[in-house]
């Protein structure tokens, strides 16, 4: 079976627009919901929300490729790139590179796409990699560009991309298509359709020696932001990483055909799920503000330190709940004081308690906001 780029009609993708239309409508409605919800977050908390969402995307787009990053280094790099106050935590090369790319995608979403845009992102992502022949430029090697798995002597070829000699021509056509399908151009496409096509189309050209997956997801984010007319804070990579195997299965299946309806349906549903993740995260920030409105004045320094530490874990809090041992480790206080502090927090309605004795666990009591 030929690869999609070997089919004579390439790159004329076929799809049933009527199957995607209801999902496009949901996307626009949810985009409005997110915008409305964010308005209920205070300006200072909005900064932290942006950092949290961008760092999640940076961490997860790397994790999809099997690369684990240091979260604190990513967040420190993001704050520096956005001109916000930051700590002196060292920015490591990989973390700095992906943070730099995420901020560029976020800040310059409205700019037209060019080869130079992609070269810039690629340099940001991979300037630390001494093993690559071509950084910040399209691949030039003569070897076949294959995605393989399995052992060295019995590899499974999942996809073979066009040869390097074809890349500049393919990318000229791709960049032209991307810009002409934007909302204010000659052939505008709906948001989810355009983002889904741009992801699959770019992945199928595979123009760089490495980093193509991360760049294709960045392109999808840029595309969505252009269609909604503002920077996208959709948790796309975060959501894809949950279903990493299915994601790769979908890509592989649709790199052998130009009929991409099922790819677009899957991608659209994934974006809609990503929007819900973002809405939940925004809701968490609103609930956090309400929590502090109710309880801040009553918290002693130890309690405030622990509450802040729990909030830092995000919407799920401590895995398995906060234990008395956690409280002791964070505050370095006596067991009697920790017991008294925790009891006070439960009585005031700041924490709820489950379990007994050494299985006792504590959880933040957050009001679900009905704002927006």
Regions from the PLM with identified roles:
Residues 1-372:
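FIC/Doc superfamily catalytic core
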């Amino acid at each position: 079976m030929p690869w999609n780029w070997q089919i004579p009609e390439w790159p004329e993708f076929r799809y049933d627009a009527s199957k995607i239309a209801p999902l496009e409508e949901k996307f626009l409605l949810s985009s409005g919901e997110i915008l409305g919800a964010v308005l209920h977050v205070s300006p200072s908390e909005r900064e932290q929300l942006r950092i949290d969402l961008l760092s999640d995307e940076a961490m997860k787009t790397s994790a999809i490729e099997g690369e684990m990053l240091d979260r604190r280094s990513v967040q420190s790099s993001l704050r520096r790139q956005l001109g916000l106050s930051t700590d002196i935590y060292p920015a490591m090369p990989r973390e700095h590179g992906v943070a730099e790319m995420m901020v560029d995608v976020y800040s310059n979403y409205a700019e037209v796409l060019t080869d130079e845009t992609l070269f810039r992102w690629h340099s940001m992502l991979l300037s630390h990699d001494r093993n690559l022949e071509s950084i910040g430029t399209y691949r030039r090697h003569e070897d076949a560009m294959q995605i393989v798995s399995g052992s060295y002597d019995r590899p499974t070829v999942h996809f073979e991309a066009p040869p390097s000699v074809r890349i500049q021509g393919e990318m000229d056509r791709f960049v032209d298509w991307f810009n002409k399908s934007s909302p204010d151009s000659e052939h505008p496409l709906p948001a989810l359709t355009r983002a889904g096509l741009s992801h699959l189309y770019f992945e199928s050209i595979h123009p760089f020696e490495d980093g193509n997956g991360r760049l294709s997801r960045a392109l999808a984010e840029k595309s969505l932001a252009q269609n909604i007319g503002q920077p996208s804070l959709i948790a796309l990579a975060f959501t894809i990483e949950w279903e990493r195997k299915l994601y790769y299965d979908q890509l592989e299946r649709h790199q052998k055909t130009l009929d991409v309806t099922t790819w677009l349906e899957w991608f659209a549903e994934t974006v809609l799920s990503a929007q819900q993740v973002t809405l939940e995260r925004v809701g968490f920030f609103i609930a956090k503000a309400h929590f502090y409105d109710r309880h801040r004045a009553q918290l002693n320094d130890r309690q405030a330190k622990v509450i802040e530490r729990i909030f830092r874990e995000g919407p799920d809090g401590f895995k398995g709940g906060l234990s008395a041992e956690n409280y002791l480790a964070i505050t370095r206080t006596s067991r009697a004081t920790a017991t008294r502090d925790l009891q006070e927090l439960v009585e005031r309605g700041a924490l709820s308690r489950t379990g007994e004795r050494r299985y006792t666990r504590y959880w933040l009591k957050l009001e679900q906001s009905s704002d927006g």
